[in-house]
């Protein structure tokens, strides 16, 4: 079983989604997990403990294991991500320029089949960018941070 498959099976078995996996040259293994309700430190601890056990049993060599949430600027990698975050603001970087641009910022529309839509502000007002997962170099949510006090 490949490392990604092993980790994804473990993470999904615990009720989480594997968002991303990075392995650095210095033996560090970074795992990014999510779930609809969000991720708390206890979730990261739970996944870390289970992965440490699984990686030891499978004799996977690593120096350090880090499990965390994908953050406010979460990457979008799967069609299900675009479905889940439809209506959210995102930045999409295409592999090849379209109309002289590679980077677009706008509001995601729910995928229709394999086609994803992004409503953005063009030169002449609102415009729609249609693309597929194969067209994307990078896609991330735009963080929404509210610094207003919650007290009323």
UniProtKB/Swiss-Prot annotation:
Please provide the Gene Ontology terms (biological process) for this protein.
ribosomal small subunit assembly; translation
- NCBIfam families membership: PRK00092.2-1
Record's InterPro entries? Ribosome_maturation_RimP (IPR003728), RimP_C (IPR028998), RimP_C_sf (IPR036847), RimP_N (IPR028989), RimP_N_sf (IPR035956)
* UniProt key word Heme: no
Give the keywords, sorted.
Cytoplasm, Ribosome biogenesis
The family annotation for this protein states:
Belongs to the RimP family.
- Coarsely, its chief localization is cytoplasm
Cited Pfam families: DUF150_C (PF17384), RimP_N (PF02576)
Q: Which CDD domains match?
A: YlxS_C (cd01734)
According to the UniProt entry, where is the signal peptide? none
State whether keyword Cytoplasm applies. yes
Give the location in the cell: Cytoplasm
* Name of this chain's protein: Ribosome maturation factor RimP
The function of this protein is:
Required for maturation of 30S ribosomal subunits.
Report the GO terms under cellular component. cytosol
